[in-house]
């Protein structure tokens, strides 16, 4: 069929299949703003176009409908080197993070302002209701529209976007646009899917329909015979190597319990066979031709089921220890299933697979018996949480190709260096023959720390020599991605009558699902990032992680902290009620203070025993709680309005800024001959603005404009090693490495500048904009670099920095919530939510606020509406965004505020600490305690639903 239509003002004539999907058609025409986030359901809005004057999801159209149509995409909004009014406002406000659906947002907002000059909040919400944004938190979009409206009348107009910090510094703590925001909002090619070549093969995966089963027969011959099928990978022809999908520093503190393909299926969606074909259509047809038979086994679905004496064993294969094998290993292995498979454990992590225990750890300080004996009151409560999904707008994706004898991996990953190490080992190549290019990442939130499809894609290319694309569908994100661990946490508190704690005990049990990636470290962070908030002389913790047959779990922003913090905050609030003490008052009586030793952290390691006891070197909780109390009007009356009851709640929170004594970051900075700089950073910017942090840190040290600094990051051929984007390590680790590299280069510039000026080094200094200034005059960075590169020069000037540390930098914060609960219907309305956070010196204030809003809204979603649900046989019923319940713009609190409260930390660069993760840690307990304040019930399992409200009120 030949169709005629207008695209961004230009007439088009195309020969198409009448039923061809318009999103795919436009993307293949180079309209990279029209992206697919939700398998064509039109829920996410990443595929928004203007179709005959109306905003429409391109995925919901077929090619035949384009006949005589007028189509506009986000590519029409500005020129290639010039942003439109709305695009510029988005960049200036700092709303662009991962950027994947920001072109669609720009198009929708532009259309709104073309129709309505000054839209109301309700009109804004309606216009953006079809867009799914997982990272920005929506609140800043109101600022975008406010700024765009103001600039329509006055192009120079400004609004208050974010406060500034540190008057003693030039660029740190000041507004500066995110360095990659412009190309993202313009939809310039920067994601993995934008790099795929026309000759690329496609992988489609046949997945297990059973939660627990053995493959008894597998025949792929018919699939292999289908024209266009290039290769089929199964357990019969994949590498016989065991690994963990968790992208962590070696030796990994997780069981190496995964083979690329195995004989045993451990969850619905587990890998059976991968078809590599010339097209997606051929690959999908080939999947139907694979003949497979299973012996279905009873699944293990919960922590309690995994603990049962007669529980099926999820990992029944023999275990091999690299070091520290237990005395019982030989006996345990004598009872193992002999299928030619095994598991490897690098060092003792408390794993007992025959008992379905993937990992465990115990520790304590003080005398627990004495602590509880000294208590006037003792309470013990158990709290449960469900499985939640990260839902990045860009699903997992990888594109691999050969470049001569080298394997090139274009990846949407948080850990390019760990990915290279793992893939090289699996495909049998040396690391220097594997080149990982971290493209822009359309959202990760922890899930892209795990290596979930890259190794299959790489192996397919190595076997066939062909370029290969492997991209998850949204359904695969739910059944084959890693989600947040299910947890069951029991807290026992002893306290005096005044509420001061005498003993704290936490039993943290986690459900890791079918594989043990992060099975030690995520649950360890439950107590590690909650117990230190309330220092006590007598503390005991037990962490036990169980295998099961639910869909996989792994890294998710917060990394165990939300579960532990919910339990300790709720238990303390229940203690306060029993003692008739105000919740905020009991927090004040027990909370951590600046400079205080965090003794319990001397007993909790993250894959390694602690070497010292850290302290809260910087902590702004006193000011945070003062401001929060005032903002929420904590003690003011809460009038009842019919069935609606008002309540207020609070939770304090903390996080780390990297993993001391385990992780490392490196950086190199090169002075160019015109006085500009190129930074080669190993860090992985996944939308958090790390490249902008590195830019500003280098500019601050080198006294040059930030625009004179260009950052190359996350590319294993063009940067130095960095552990990657996890553990909130970007600013402190990658940032400090950049600071050290800049300081190293600064000394070289000063030395050679002094020589050129004929002055002692002690008499010269760097000065903005990019000069060495002495008593006799000054010389530009460009002149110094040029002299170095002449035939008689001293060579190129390069600075390097390597950062390791034994020290912690802890960000702190508090969440305040006000809810209205309808005691007749059970409806919960979140009217106010305030997130106040101490991230030290905010390097990029507007980006920091965006990080807080996004993380906090994800936490609100986990608390109010999100859950992966299963049937009794282990089939996940939640397989798309429509049924999952992640919040959109209409779901945010009416009064939603993020506040930066600074402190000065000695570990982070220029006093900075992390910001991206801590925001997810406190919403659930703040909301739950507000619900209790409203109607007197304790919800000990989250998320919170009207049904749970009415059940607790004994109305159903």
Model-derived regions: residue spans:
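Signature of N-terminal electron-transfer/Fe-S-associated modules in redox systems
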Residues: 1-162, 171, 390
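Intrinsic disorder at enzyme termini
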Residues: 105, 128-192, 627-628, 635-639, ...
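Conserved beta-strand/loop scaffold segments within soluble protein domains that form the structured core
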Residues: 294, 419, 438-440, 445-538
């Amino acid at each position: 069929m030949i169709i005629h239509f207008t695209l961004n003002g230009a007439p088009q004539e195309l020969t198409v299949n009448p039923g061809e999907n318009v999103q795919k058609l436009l993307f293949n025409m180079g309209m990279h703003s029209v992206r697919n986030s939700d398998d064509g359901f039109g829920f996410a809005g990443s595929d928004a176009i203007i179709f005959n004057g109306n905003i429409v999801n391109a995925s919901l159209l077929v090619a035949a409908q384009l006949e005589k149509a007028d189509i506009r995409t986000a590519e029409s909004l500005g020129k290639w080197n010039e942003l439109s009014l709305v695009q510029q406002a988005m960049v200036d406000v700092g709303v662009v993070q991962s950027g994947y659906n920001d072109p669609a947002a720009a198009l929708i907002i532009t259309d709104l302002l073309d129709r309505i000059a000054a839209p109301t909040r309700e009109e804004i919400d309606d216009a953006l209701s079809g867009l799914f944004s997982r990272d920005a938190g929506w609140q800043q979009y109101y600022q975008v529209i406010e700024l765009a409206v103001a600039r329509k009348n006055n192009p120079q107009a400004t609004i208050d976007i974010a406060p500034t910090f540190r008057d003693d510094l030039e660029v740190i703590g000041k507004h500066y646009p995110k360095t990659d925001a412009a190309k993202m909002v313009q939809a310039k090619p920067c994601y993995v899917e934008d790099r795929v070549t026309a000759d690329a093969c496609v992988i489609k995966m046949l997945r297990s329909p059973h939660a627990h089963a053995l493959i008894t027969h597998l025949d792929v011959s018919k699939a292999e015979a289908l024209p266009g099928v290039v290769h089929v990978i199964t357990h019969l022809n994949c590498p016989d190597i065991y690994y963990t999908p968790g992208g962590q520093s070696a030796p990994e503190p997780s069981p190496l319990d995964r083979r690329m393909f195995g004989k045993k299926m451990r969850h619905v969606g587990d890998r059976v066979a991968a078809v590599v074909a010339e097209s997606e259509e051929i690959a999908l047809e080939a999947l139907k031709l694979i003949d497979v038979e299973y012996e279905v086994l009873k699944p293990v679905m919960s922590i309690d089921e995994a603990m049962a004496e007669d529980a099926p064993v999820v990992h029944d294969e023999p275990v091999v220890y690299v070091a520290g094998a237990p005395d019982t290993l030989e006996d345990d292995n004598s009872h193992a299933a002999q299928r030619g498979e095994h598991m490897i454990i690098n060092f003792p992590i408390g794993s007992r697979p025959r008992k379905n225990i993937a990992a465990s750890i115990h520790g304590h300080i003080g005398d627990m018996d004495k602590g509880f004996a000294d208590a006037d009151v003792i309470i013990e409560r158990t709290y449960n949480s469900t499985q939640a999904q990260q839902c990045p707008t860009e699903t997992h994706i990888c594109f691999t190709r050969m470049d001569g004898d080298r394997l090139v991996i274009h990846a949407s990953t948080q850990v390019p260096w760990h990915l290279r190490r793992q893939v090289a080992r699996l495909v049998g190549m040396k690391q220097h023959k594997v080149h990982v290019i971290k493209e822009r990442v359309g959202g990760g939130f922890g899930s892209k720390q795990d290596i979930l499809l890259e190794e299959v894609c790489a192996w397919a290319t190595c076997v066939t020599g062909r370029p290969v694309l492997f991209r998850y569908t949204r359904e695969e994100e739910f059944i084959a991605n890693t989600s947040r661990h299910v947890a069951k946490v029991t807290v026992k508190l002893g306290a005096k009558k005044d509420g001061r704690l005498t003993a704290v005990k936490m039993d943290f049990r986690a459900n890791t699902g079918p594989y043990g990636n992060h099975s030690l470290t995520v649950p360890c962070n439950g107590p590690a990032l909650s117990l230190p908030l309330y220092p006590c002389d007598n503390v005991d913790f037990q962490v036990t992680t169980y295998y099961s047959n639910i869909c996989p779990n792994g890294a998710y922003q917060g990394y165990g902290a939300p579960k532990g913090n919910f339990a300790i905050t709720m238990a303390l609030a229940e203690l306060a009620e029993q003692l008739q003490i105000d919740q905020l008052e009991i927090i004040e009586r027990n909370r951590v203070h600046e400079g205080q030793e965090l003794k319990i952290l001397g007993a909790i390691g993250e894959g390694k025993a602690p070497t010292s006891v850290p302290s809260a070197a910087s902590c702004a909780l006193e000011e945070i709680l003062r401001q929060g109390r005032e903002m929420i009007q904590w003690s003011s009356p809460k009038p009842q309005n019919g069935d609606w009851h008002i309540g207020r709640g609070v939770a304090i929170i903390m996080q780390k800024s990297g993993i001391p004594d385990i992780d490392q970051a490196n950086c190199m900075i090169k002075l160019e001959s015109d006085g500009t700089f190129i930074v080669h950073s190993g860090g992985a910017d996944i939308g958090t603005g790390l490249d902008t942090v590195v830019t500003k840190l280098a500019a601050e040290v080198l006294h040059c404009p930030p625009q004179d600094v260009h950052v190359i990051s996350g590319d294993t051929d063009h940067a130095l090693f960095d552990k990657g984007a996890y553990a909130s390590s970007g600013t402190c680790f990658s940032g400090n490495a950049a600071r050290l590299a800049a300081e190293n280069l600064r000394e070289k510039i000063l030395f050679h500048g002094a020589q050129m000026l004929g002055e002692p080094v002690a008499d010269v200094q760097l000065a903005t904009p990019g000069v060495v200034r002495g008593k006799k005059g000054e010389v530009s960075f460009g002149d110094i670099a040029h002299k170095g590169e002449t035939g008689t020069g001293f060579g190129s000037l390069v600075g390097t920095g390597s950062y390791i540390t034994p020290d912690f930098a802890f960000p702190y914060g508090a969440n305040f919530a006000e809810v209205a609960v309808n005691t007749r219907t059970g409806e919960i309305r979140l009217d106010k939510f305030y997130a106040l956070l101490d991230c030290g010196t905010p390097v990029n204030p507007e980006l920091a606020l965006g990080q807080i809003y996004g993380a906090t809204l994800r936490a609100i979603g986990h608390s109010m509406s999100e859950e992966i649900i299963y049937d009794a046989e282990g089939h996940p019923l939640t397989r798309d965004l429509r049924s999952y319940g992640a919040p959109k713009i209409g779901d945010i609190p009416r009064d939603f505020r993020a506040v930066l409260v600074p402190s000065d930390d000695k570990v982070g660069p220029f006093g900075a600490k992390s910001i991206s993760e801590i925001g997810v840690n406190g919403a659930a307990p703040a909301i739950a305690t507000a619900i209790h304040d409203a109607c007197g019930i304790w919800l000990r399992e989250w998320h919170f639903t009207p049904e749970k409200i009415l059940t607790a009120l004994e109305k159903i």
